[in-house]
């Protein structure tokens, strides 16, 4: 499932959380980019395949890869072969967009929950610097041993990470640890923490997300802008 046709536009690939669909995400996110000045931003909302999830009692739901446990903690180990297969699918979408003529600096990979985990894994292993990666209530689904596999160009992609401190599905510690790891390896990761927020998207996050995308597209480059801090930002 490819992204929008090429041209002088910003491209946002949005990866939903497990149990959701791309159309559900579209209904929630797309209205924030409906203003005329954002008409150049094109979204893609693919839907994950379905599979039986043992930790949900064998329920068949959409999922990008296996879910080993709930809640997800900073120590949760994922089936990395499955994660990498999902990453390959995302890379195919990105390759298609670049081949169609879109500048990598205008491409953003974003996601919620498991989709956020897949987004950051995909960006870290992609051989080009992208416009950015945005993680909502996600985690890092690969062990730290994969750090040596991160291309130098991927390390230049800026990251924005949102996480609620009341999240009971993907614990706050998992998001905090993921962003801290990115900073340890020299990446720009802005972390937005929300004390009362659970495992969901809220208006404040989406408004900040919209402005973040606008700022980067106005630059025409994926490098961080001076106004964004790579320090932990407690809301």
UniProtKB/Swiss-Prot annotation:
InterPro entries: AB_hydrolase_fold, LYPA1-2/EST-like, PLipase/COase/thioEstase. One of its GO terms (molecular function) is palmitoyl-(protein) hydrolase activity. GO terms for cellular component: cytoplasm. Pfam families: Abhydrolase_2. Belongs to the AB hydrolase superfamily. AB hydrolase 2 family. Possesses carboxylesterase activity in vitro. This is Probable carboxylesterase Os04g0669600. It comes from Oryza sativa subsp. japonica (Rice).
